């Protein structure tokens, strides 16, 4: 069982609202289901097909159980934005931190763009 503090932070940060009023929120199980759905979508897209093998399904099921049991964690960005429309349209919304070598004005533009998306940038 998660501590009260962890539950408050999870509700505030990761559980997505289920209604327009923002009075009902995902449960931890629903949040993890959304994360697994996002991971499945990433896998299908990377493979270029929508059929996963039995081994891949088993890996997703194992990941889901580890996340539900709080024995493993994914990036906070994935908990927050995973399987949302914005994460599919703007992949940079999922960037957490990055590194670049700034040599030109174009590199500065890239850095500013990433910073505006909420991504930390080291250089």
Predicted features, each with a name:
Residues 1-123:
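Extended catalytic cores of very large enzyme megasubunits
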